[in-house]
Amino acid sequence: MYKRQDLTATLEYKEEAPAADSVARKITLKGLRGGHSGLEINQGRGNANKLLARVAHDVLIEFDSQLASFEGGNMRNAIPREACAVLVFNPEDTEGLEEYIKEYEAQINAEYAPIESGITLTIEPVELPAAIVPAEIQDNMINVLMACQDGVMRMIPTVPDTVETSSNLAIVIIGGGKAEVRILARSSCDTMKEFLADSLTACFAMAGMKVELSGGYSGWQPNVDSPILHAMKESYKKQFGTEPAVKVIHAGLECGIIGAIIPGLDMISFGPTLRSPH
């Protein structure tokens, strides 16, 4: 039913060496439910990349620290469950850091209850990395992760409780002189998908990143007068003695790809019930 678009934003930068007397800490966020970035995007679940960017933003300011690396997510069409970042500190600036992280963990759990439960935010000492992200690049990257659209953008005006347009901040990799962000955008409306892609492109361009769009495919507009749909409904009713549920879903289907190749083809999509596909 839905059209999708893959967005990849990239940036290369020259690494800097941390001060020799610095110390490093790894902050890890885990325990989120994750899920399918289409079917479950409307459930208000936490996005690990978004949440950790928020944590890193505050820690970088409060503790005058520097970003060495950031990594979260592994699939474009899955809401990321985990993310981690390595930050570098002056030894004297780490006082109160563990308590700060513990309080932040409690805050996030309170914000997302009861949708999420058992979110963990931990911090641990790690070996001092050989390089850190330059301050300007660091700020631009964290700011763009904070600012970019994530989650439901708009519902379908004529179909109550059904998502029209959404995006998923799926994968973030920063480190080794490179930064890469991958987002999956979805919409049942071509023009809204284009608007979302343009908005995301503009956002990442302000951070100095190069943006490429790929992997787009057509949606599949439902036909309530479809002969095969009516035949299928009658067959289902005879077999099970009840009316089948005919629904629009916020996810890509093979029918969209096939329909783009063979215009006007009468199609339906049916199968077993799917719960928590990711």
Q: PLM features: residue spans?
A:
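Active-site-adjacent substrate-binding region
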Residues: 56-60, 64-70, 222-265
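Generic, well-ordered alpha-helical scaffold segments in large soluble proteins
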Residues: 55-58, 100-107, 199-203, 235, ...
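Zn-dependent metallopeptidase/amidohydrolase metal-coordination segment
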Residues: 157, 164-179, 184, 243-278
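C-terminal structural cap/anchor segments
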Residues: 175-231
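A structural preference for short, hydrophobic beta-strand core positions in alpha/beta folds
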Residues: 69, 123-125, 211-215, 246-248
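Midchain, well-structured core segments that form catalytic/ion-binding scaffolds
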Residues: 3-186
